[in-house]
Amino acid sequence: MISLSLVLLLLFGVRCFDSAGQINDDSPLFISTSIDNSMNLKILVEKKPYFTGSVTGYKLYYTNDSSQTNEEYEKWMHQEALSNQNSYNFVIDANKHEIVSGDVYRVRATVFFNNVESVPTGVISINTRQSIPKAPLIVNTKILYNSSVLISFVPADDVNAIENYTLMYKQMEAEEWKSLNFKSDFDGKVLLDGLIPNHTYEIKIFVTGGIVQGTPSNLATFTTNSTALALVKTEPDEEYTADPQTNEPLSITCTVKSVSKASVLWKVNGIKVSVDSSFYTVVTSVHEDFIESTIRAKSRTRSAKFTCLATNDAGDSSKEVNVIIKGPGSPPSEITLVAEKRGYTISWKPPSHPNGKITKYVVYHTLNREDPLSDWRKIDLDGSEKMVRIIMDTEESFYGRVQAATELGPGIISDIVAMERDTQPISVESDLFGVSATTMVVNPRETLSIQCTARGKPRPSISVAISDRKNASQVEVDVWSRLQATSSAGIVSAVHNFSVLTSKFVHCRAKNSAGSNYSTMELKVDKPGDAPTQIQVLSVNALDALVVWHSPQFPNSPITSYIVLVSNDDKEDKSTWLQYESNAKETQINRMLLPTGNLEKSTEYFVCVRAKNAAGIGPTSSLISFITLNGGPDSPPDNLKVLINEANQVIVYWNTPNSTTEVTGYLIYYTRDLSLSNDDYKNWQFVEMNNNSTRYKFDLSVGLKPKTFYRVRISGKNSHADGPASEVVEFETAYSEVPIPTDLKTEVLDDNTIHIKFNAVRDPDDHSKALGEYRIDLAATDDVLHALWKQIEPKSIKIDEISSMVDVEIDGDSVEKNQMYWVKVTARLDNPSWGMHSSKPRWFRTGHGKLMTSVTLEGAPLIEKEPNLFEELSVTCTGMGSPAPIITWEWMNKSIENGTEGWNILNIQIDDTTVVSKITRNNIRESGDLTCLANNNEGSSSASVEIRVLGPGNPPENIILTAYRNQINVTWQESTLPNGDIMKYIVYYSENENDDLSDWNKFETAELETYVETFGPHTKHFIRVQAVSDRGPGIISNVLSCISDVLYETIHLEIVASNILDFEAEPNQNVEIRCKGTGKPQPELFYQFANETEQNFVEVETNDMDLFEAKAPEINSRRNVTVTCRASNKYENVTISKVIIIKRPGEAPTNISWSFEEEYDSTLYINWNPIENANGEKLEYNLYLSNYKTKVSGPPVKIPDIPLDVNISLRVSAENEYGEGEKTFPIWIPTPNGGPKTAPILSSLHAQDSKVYIFWVEPRLPNGEIQNYTIYIQKENESENEEHSIDKEWKKFIYGSNITHVIIGVDDGLEENERYQMKMTATNQRHEGPETKVYTFDLISFDENDVIDNFTAIVINSTVFVEVGNPIYTKYNIYIREDGNNQTVKHEIDVESGKTTFEFPFQLDHTLSYTIKMSGMKLGRESPPSEEIDLEFISSPSPTPIISGSRRKVIKEPPL
């Protein structure tokens, strides 16, 4: 009971206890519980085998009310069952009791012996919380050198990959476990450190953190630091130094010696080398006493730290080799050469493999490609430089190369970049197996062949690279492999064979001195690229073998499942192997229970694994083998015990083996021979027994020696083989057996007749003879210690000669009813010297002594009938009891009421103890159990008969007929009375309802729907359906009818273009489209152009051949356009599409712009918007420049050597591989005149003493040699409305190119007191250049006559009146200042010419004194001011003055 309670506690959160908290061993019942997925509680009660008496029923008490105590169990809810079996299953229904997760139920149970209830079991608590998580699986323990261990495990199927775990560990000899809590990852690994060196530990893992602790994993053991680390040596040893070299590989060899199994891997700069690396390859060979692994670099171009890592049971050991490349391993990248006026510019970027800090760059250049490099000119530059300009006047070919260097040395020199006259642009194409595409799907490890084809001049070389990078220009230089190429008719081609494990980009590169070009193809690998690794078979039993493996390194898309293949012949084709599929996990390690039940016993089997994803199945792993078991029990009996009973007999007890195979019997091995070892138990003496008991008594027939030490062990067996033996138990026999009856069992019959059974006692003087006389003593008491024994004469004593079992019968009248008795038995011996020895007392309880209620059914327990709506079912039941019982009937556990559902019951009482009941039913349609129940005051009894109907009891339901096309669809639902498993349906159909059913057409189907081919359109059809189960055919349905629909013919549709061939049209050409076809009923027609809204045809023509046709509006397009026709009727919706192919370019280029190079007039730049509809793969553009035509790849375009000072016409068209497209309208372009590009730069302009001084510098872009400068001067117009003067009014002053400043004055024709405008130009040997902007200057001057010296000023009220004696100005500036203050107020006055007086308003303080002065304005310049005079205040008014405009502002003057 203790072990059972522990199991229940672990599995279901269940505990078993009595009111005192102890397990109740007095109950005659075992009790166990379980919970199904629907939360139903299932309770199994079993009578303990050593309790005797007739079982008459069971009772289950249960409650979820925590307020009720365990002692009040009789007030709990309960279920009672009548049964004479030794076990019974109770079910507490979850729906009825509304059981939910988290409920806690307590249960107890009792058994009825002879209708007397026993003491209850202990209390079991059932918590309906979640079930316990399954156990993880420890796969591997990797011992590390620092007394730590890396543990790999696989999580159970019912937990997530990321979960909380507890790791329990202890030393083997220790009692106490230690724990480590951790959270798992997808790799399923955990590190346990802090262990003691050279000690053996055992570990287990289980899920924690939830409501219920998980099931512990398998135990794993390991010993820390029991193995030495592997010895690792490398060649070269620690450092390797070499010059960079692209055509020589680099190899490093690692030799590993280990006392245990070891594995080797390489790392470069700390990163593990992948098997699909495009630069590194690793070759490893395993020898008898060492492992040799070599890593090979494709070229000697990369400095790196190489690490050889060896792993064995002791941990990891490694050796590093530092590879130093003395200089950059690749040339500078992205080198470009640009031709400019008077030279070339070379630019570059740093090398991809600098192998240190770049300290300088060396640029080589020459005009003769064939010169040796030593004759090329050389330019040394700092490491920070990224370009250089080389001045050179020649227009011949130019060649350059660039090299980088570090402080360790120079690097790889670049290929030649060139600017040559006779070159042809490079084009390159690639195809795989003759197919050219941007993306192709390939299989992993498939041998692929790519052909690279190139054109160009000079002849290009061809290289190939397989990389993860999509951009070919970004692929590392040393990854490219140059191919052996062949040339024919200007076409260079090369072929490269390779394979890939995962998706890659394969690049073809064509390269010559003029540049390079690339062709790229993406290779998509969808299937798994490699096989699962590290296959292991961890355990094997009779049912299954546990296989674990690691996921593939290159899954390429999520792994959905794994396929495990098994065979006992590793040479057999894999297609014939047994295959088992298991779902994939997200973890690194996966597992599967491989069924072994059908495999041959004791046979070696081979296992391999394949990964599978959505794209297909990957390659097969390496093989691993295991040997199946012999078929016998796969575990030994446990808990073996040896006891000596009261008769000094040896009794052996054990537990049944926990075996996955059947145990049919046991072999009990025993010996007293000390020369035979425990492992040699097969040579011990043994006895055999069957599997109906786990107890064996060594009686005198075995012949054990008295007072002797024996060893015993037990193994299970079955028809295949013997199982492993148990542990060895030693025992010592007694001096002799005592003649005492043992193993008493009692049985009380209904009339209180008592049977006492036990093994016969052997005559101690003659062991071959069994004693036949016994004395029986009874005591009617509950207290055996104070019992008053009374000898009873038995009614009879019988001995079974075969089994030596004694059966003593005692008359029921000699005992009291309903009384507890104790019994003991004593053998009567002929030899009194042995004495009188009684058995152990045994208790039993008598019954009431009355006739038990019982029922019997006439006939067999199974009645089989074919379904019939008109045949009657009849069953007769006889009930007996005291008094005569009342008989009722149940159908499928539900009470039957007389006269309902076709049932009729007739009861006849024969006498006081017997009743006969006959039940009938008016049809035979339903299978089930029919039960007869008899009840009276003394008890109840029941008997059942199974009614098995041989076919469905009703026809399929909800039969629906639907006329559709040229058939009638028939659907239905399953019969509600299937009477077994429905296997098929029979469909009958006919044109004539009155035909005999045998004349109807019929067919069979397993589905719930089918169809019947019609006899013709608009025809009435009659249909019936019948279900057939695994027992036979059922009731056929009634007749249903349906009229078939109109005639149906499949729609066939096509699209025709009447004015073009093969659906190829010119750009913007009008195309006539017609849709036509056949089909019934006649469909409605629709058309659609590209993504426009679908339209229906207004007119549809038909002819006698049932052909329909419709014409769509004309369509034109500049690109490929899809034309769609759709025909739709009540049955079909058919759509077809065809593409009108536009091959030539769809339109002319637009938005054309042009410009000339700022520095060189003869270079023309043309740009335009690329066309939208190329309609081809190879698009070029035609330029028509007057009478000149050229092809270009696209805008912008640079055209040198354009003639100067002329008008040229420009037209542009697009052209693809199918032809030329539309040209643009002509554009007239005036070319530059060749003069300076910019005007002279005026540095100074000022006038003084009737002269103007002009300084300038040469134009920024003279566009040649300056010949002279021209200065233009004219008077500034006085009126704003006057038009600008014409060029002939400008005075020209021409000076030589060596003049940069001039002085122009009155002597040169300029006039004093005038304002002038000035501009200038420069002229080179070809033409005059652009003008500067227009500047202004004047030659105005003032003398003493220009100073105002005769004026007066007075103030009247708030107005100032001024009178000028000699007015020479029309604009005046008047300055008014307060005495003693330097702040002056300025007024600007405009007056008419010759006017002598004017006034302006001004607020002044009459208590203060003010002064006033004046100046005049001439041609925008102010004259010298007059002298200051006092401002006079007059209080009397004066005549009204003339008002003139005045502007006043405060100005700041310095003090006098």
UniProtKB/Swiss-Prot annotation:
Residues 1-16 form the signal peptide. CDD domains: FN3. The keyword Repeat applies. This is Ig-like and fibronectin type-III domain-containing protein C27B7.7. PROSITE patterns: FN3, IG_LIKE. Coiled coil: none annotated. The lineage of its organism: Eukaryota, Metazoa, Ecdysozoa, Nematoda, Chromadorea. Keywords: Disulfide bond, Glycoprotein, Immunoglobulin domain, Repeat, Secreted, Signal. The keyword Repeat applies. One of its GO terms (cellular component) is extracellular region.
